[in-house]
């Protein structure tokens, strides 16, 4: 997934939006390019688009270290008319699974390896060139290679440090097996 939402002036958030704000319901029915494919029951061009309520979960409020003077809060997505959770929203799907585990006497603990590629050109350059002829930042396998991955530290060190400062339990990062591939590990929590 990706973070979607709005940027509020702090005072407006405190005065008017700390309990709810709104978004178009197409946000849960778009592809990565923000196109709205047909076939979704909850929203479509044929039936029109409505609103969802975004209800801030203030327990998730945290400073965003990489943007000065910025905080972030995650929201639950509610139906505009019933004020009930939208069942296909990512947080609602996750909460149902956590509730199922709890009912079975199990406490969920997760960790993840976030694997991705770094390229020589910027995303904007790559997009303009049609995502063709991508050149990885490294020309070979850098799996566990401390010396060679030093050249990626201008990206990886701030990533580790900013996420950790935002409360994400970062464990480590390392090179991976494919050219230009990186791995960021998040500790069990």
Please report, for each region that a protein language model flagged, where it lies by residue.
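Active-site neighborhood of thiol-dependent amide/isopeptide-bond enzymes
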Residues: 188-189
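Active-site-proximal, well-structured secondary-structure segments within enzyme catalytic domains
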Residues: 172-185
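ATP/Mg2+-dependent ligation/transfer catalytic cores
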Residues: 2-175
């Amino acid at each position: 997934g990706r973070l979607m939402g709005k940027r509020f002036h702090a005072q407006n958030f405190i005065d008017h939006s700390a309990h709810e704000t709104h978004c178009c319901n197409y946000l849960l029915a778009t592809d990565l390019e923000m196109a709205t494919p047909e076939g979704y029951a909850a929203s479509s061009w044929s039936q029109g688009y409505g609103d969802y309520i975004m209800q801030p979960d203030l327990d998730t409020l945290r400073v965003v270290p990489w943007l000065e003077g910025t905080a972030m809060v995650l929201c639950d997505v509610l139906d505009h008319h019933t004020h009930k959770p939208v069942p296909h929203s990512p947080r609602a799907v996750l909460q149902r699974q956590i509730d199922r585990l709890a009912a079975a006497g199990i406490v969920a603990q997760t960790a993840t390896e976030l694997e991705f590629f770094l390229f020589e050109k910027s995303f904007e350059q790559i997009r303009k060139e049609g995502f063709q002829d991508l050149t990885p930042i490294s020309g070979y396998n850098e799996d566990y290679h401390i010396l060679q991955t030093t050249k990626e530290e201008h990206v990886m060190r701030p990533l580790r440090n900013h996420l950790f400062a935002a409360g994400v339990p970062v464990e480590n990062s390392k090179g991976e097996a494919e050219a230009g591939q990186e791995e960021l590990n998040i500790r069990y929590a």
